[in-house]
Every structure is written in C-alpha cells, then in structure tokens.
Amino acid sequence: MATSQRKILVTSALPYANGPIHLGHMLEYIQTDIWSRYQKLRGHECHYICADDAHGTPIMLKAQQLGMAPEEMIAQVNKEHQQDFADFNIAFDNYHSTHSEENRVLASDIYLKLRANGYIKSKSISQLFDPEQSMFLPDRFVKGTCPKCKSPDQYGDNCDACGATYSPTELINPKSAVSGATPVMKDTEHFFFDLPAFEDMLKEWTRSGALQTEMANKLDEWFEQGLQQWDITRDAPYFGFEIPDAPGKYFYVWLDAPIGYMGSFKNLCDKRPELSFDEFWAKDSKAEVYHFIGKDIVYFHSLFWPAMLYGSGYRQPNSVYAHGYVTVNGAKMSKSKGTFIKARTYLDHLDPEYLRYYYAAKLSSRIDDLDLNLEDFAQRVNSDLVGKLVNLASRTAGFITKRFDGKLAKITDTTLTEVFLAKQEQIAEFYETREYGKAMREIMALADIANGFVADAAPWQMVKHDDQQEAAHQVCSNALNLFRILVTYLKPVLPRLAQDVEAFFQQTLTWDGLGQDMAGHEIAPFKAMMQRVELDKVNAMVADSKENLQATTEPEAPKGPLATDPISDTINYEDFAKIDLRIARIVKAEHVAEADKLLKLQLDIGGETRQVFAGIKSAYSPEDLEGKLTVMVANLAPRKMRFGMSEGMVLAAGPGGSDLWILEPHEGAQPGMRVK
C-alpha cells in the first residue's frame, strides 16, 4: 500500500520530428508509460510529459526536400506521432513541441543565467564548411572515420560504435553529408558551455544513485578522458532559436531539446492552474523528476543536462534510466528484411497490447538490448495472455451468468486469494525498479496456479450434478476473483484489457481494492477480450514493411555480417605494419568487481606477462579461457582504467554481448610469435 502521495514528473526522450515512429522507439514509450501508469495506480500524483524534438539542420533540409516550410512539416509530424502514441495507449499528460514559445523563453532564460554565472565562453573557431552548399556543417552533417576506434561512416559529434564524443574536425576523411563534398575550414565565432567547471558536481551526482551502474561506470571513463567545453552554437542557416544578443547564431539542438521537458511541463501548467512549475523545477524542489532514455544519448542527459540545470539555478533529475536497443529476430532492424517496422504498420495488423506485454516481459532495469523475436512474440502472447489469463475468465464466467444470476458467491476458502495478495508488494517493487520481466513472471506463475485450480475442480462437471451447484458457484467465483487480481496487477501493462475487465466486473480496478470482498457482486455477460496472434498477420506486417522499403527505392543492404558492420576505409600497407599482433596464452582469467562486461586476463606473450581487460564477460566464464591461445595487439598504448592498467587488446569476432568469439590460433603457434 502507498504510504504517502508522491509528486512525480516523468519523461521519455523526445522523438525527432523528421520521420515516423518505429518499434525501436516504442520500447521506451511503453517502458515509461508502464511506470507512469503504475505510479498513478498506487495513488501518486504523476505527470508523464513529452514533446517532439523539432529543431536542427536535418529538419531544415528535410523540409526543403519536401517543398515545405519547417514549421509546416513539424506540425504534420507532430500530429502523426501523437496518433501513433495514442493508438499504442501511451497516456501522456502532455505532448508538446520544442518549437514553442515556452521552450524559447526557457532556453533563453537558462542560457542567460549560465552566461551571467560565467559558464558561457566565446571564442573564434575554424569550422567545416560545405563549399558547394555555402553553409557551415553541423556535426551530424559531417561523416567520416571515428578518430578513436576507427569505425567508418560515423557522425561528427559521437561514434555509434564506441560511444566516443569529439568535434567534427577530428573525423578522419570527413565528407559533407549534404553534398558529398570535402569540407573546407572557415572561421566563425561560437559560444561554449564550460562543462569542465562542473566536474566535481557531476562526479558526485553520477555516484549518488541517480544512474544505473553501467551508466556510472561509462561516465567514469569520460571523466578519466577529461571533460571538454561544449559548443552550443550553430550558424545560419539553421532552424531553431536564435541566441540572445547574437544575430545569425542559433542554439544547437541539444541545448534546447532537454529544455523541452521543462517547456512541455510549463505548457501543462498553463492549462492546469493548480500545477506549479516551480514546485517541480525549483532548486529546492521536493518533487521527483525521472528521465527515461536510450543508451545512445546517455552523454547528453548525464553530463550536459544536469550541469546546465545546476549552473542556471534549477534542480537536477532524481534519476536518468537508460535502456538498450531493439533487435528483431536476433539482428539489427532491417528495411530489406522487413524488420524495420513502423508503429503504424504494426497497428495496421496487430493489437498494441501484444507488444506492450512482450516488451514488458523482456524488460529489466539493466541497459541490455531487447530482441523482438517474432515467433516467440506470437507464442508468448498466445500462451500467457490468451491461454492463461483471459482463458481463466472465459471458461468460468458463463456459469456465473447462466446459473447464478450473474452474482459472485461468498468465497469460503480464501487460501488462493491470500496467496495472490501476498505477492502484491513484490510485484509493486518490480514495477517501481523497472524489473517488468520479473513482475510478468510472478503474475504468470499466479495465473498457472489459478488455471490449475480450475482444471482440478472442473466446474463444467460439477454443474451437471444438483448437489454440487454451490461448489461450482464457489469455484467459478473464486476463479473470477483471482482473474480480477491478476488483471489489476497487469493494468499498467494492458490498459485496454483492464478497461474491458472493468466493464465486465462493472467496477474500477484499483490497487487498494485488490483484497475487496466480491460476495454478491454482479458481473456483466462475458465478451471475448483478446484474440490469438495469427502468424499470417505477423508475416503480412513484415511483408508490408518490405513494400514500404521498395516504395522508397533504396538499394538493398548487404547480407550477412556486412549488413551491420561494413568494411572499413582502405588503409595502406605501412599503416597495417604499425600494428604488432602476437600469439598469447591466457594464463589466468578472473571477474572484475563492479564491472558488468569485463574479465581481467593475464597473458603470456613469450617471456613477458601482460594484463588486459577484455569486454567478453557475457560470452565466457573465466575457467573456460585459462590455457587457451589467442591473438593480442601487443603495441597498443597502455590504458589506465578504474580497475587497473590494460596493456593491450585481445581480438574477438561477433556482434557483441554473448555473441563473441575470441580468436584461437592453431596449436602450432606459440606465445610471442608475431601474426603476419
């Protein structure tokens, strides 16, 4: 039971207003919506707000391609986004746009406060300029090879492969993503946010419990590398807010985008006078603020955003929760395979409750990627929701309606009810800590118990005997009460089903009412509540996604591993000759405390022992590695890590996680031999 009412503001990351929502996006909105609905079910004051991220060069250029004004395009996209979210039963309390007066005022206010407090620096920089388009190139419109890990085809602000951040001028072999031209350097004056000034505050905040352990560990790496001043300026032409007192200069989209959380809430406060903006955002606020985001935008939300808030006199979020990516059938979402599925394409074929449940069943508090296996998806929904949950009511409700005037009996044996109610605090804890998968397993285990009870009692046999009518009434009433408890537990996940069940019971399902005595309560006639997932509908959805691809006339992507990891840019022989690869024997392997992905390896390279930290924990146990031969980069500069010094790198193949295989040379190779 909730002991006191909390005041909570919860957000999802703002979808970019230049295209449709897809099933990868939907993971986050479903995750956040479940958490928000759970808080409201417990009686807390919870406001779930979001907005379209509507600024930046990509939007300006996309609008030009469509022959539209940017304002017209983002209004159209906003309408489409809101319809998709509504049809997936995402219950925002407010959905707005960063291109709003509220956001302009707040962005200017925060900037001016940062400037007054000495956190904005001005300097002349040399920036990449497209000579064919006569425009400065924002970081996302320069592509090249990552200067840190050498992955090709990376954007000019951060690397999707290794997570590093850098300036566009650090890219190797940069190209304009607008024209393909090789950019030239041109001087311009820019304003910078002095992020290094907040290092001590950020270190304290990131270790305060505000972040998941994996996120905090990643931030430690960034702290070790040193924080850099952040360029918050973009030159005209640009679609966004002009910087105060700086004609022709605009706020970089990542400055005003997170402020969009505040802008959307301010818009809600203007609609609802009883709400106080300052009660949630003032420095001394006692309300709670939580951000749900994808792991690709951790840097902005865990460094820039809390520092901006602190430096301008606002409160920091209580927590930032990151999740992983969505894969489909074990691979990256693919347009050519039809697994890059838009939200609208899914809705054209399947019930949104199916996906809400499947994502919930696989979500945890960790930052693991989630695989949408379409065959498993159909099997799990059919087994859990149709076969276990709804079936519990469908095979008992008819007897209550036809034989007992639609009224439930006084249950004399409350043993099962007590078992079900005893789980409420555990299930509540799982919802609160975002361990939805554990909650779903607990609930389905209870559903198994309830179905076993009905199967053993067999009320369909009881009703054939005059002397067993009351026993049948007891069994069916008990089963329906257990069904009511189960659906109440699932109400944050399955809001549409919960509505149907509320109509069936003719009452609202509440957490405080879990233990309600239902004796004499009248139910409505039972109606079908959920249909089985048909594989032909799943296949039709995939086929439609392929057709959508064909309509765009994009070339088919490469097949196999090259589809997600293309060949890197060509290097010459001299570059390759600099890499010293050696055979190494793994003498010892052990776990690293507080590291989720690392194993510590002691490597014999023929007369010398090296210590290497390798991110292969998900694929190997230490005991499986000891004694094996492998290949290491022997002349890689040592890297100081939080856990110790790493003196090289072992080579492995695979997409990552548990799908990694270290290279194992033939037994004829000996430690120390050079790989040529």
Swiss-Prot record:
Binds 1 zinc ion per subunit. It is found in: Cytoplasm. Residues 575-676 form the tRNA-binding domain. One of its GO terms (molecular function) is metal ion binding. ATP binds at K335. The keyword Cell membrane does not apply. GO terms for biological process: methionyl-tRNA aminoacylation. A motif ('HIGH' region) lies at residues 15-25. A motif ('KMSKS' region) lies at residues 332-336. One of its GO terms (cellular component) is cytosol. Zn(2+) binds at C146, C149, C159, C162. Homodimer. Belongs to the class-I aminoacyl-tRNA synthetase family. MetG type 1 subfamily. NCBIfam families: metG, metG_C_term, PRK00133.1. HAMAP family: Met_tRNA_synth_type1 (MF_00098). PANTHER family: METHIONINE--TRNA LIGASE, METHIONINE--TRNA LIGASE, CYTOPLASMIC. This is Methionine--tRNA ligase. It comes from Shewanella oneidensis (strain ATCC 700550 / JCM 31522 / CIP 106686 / LMG 19005 / NCIMB 14063 / MR-1).
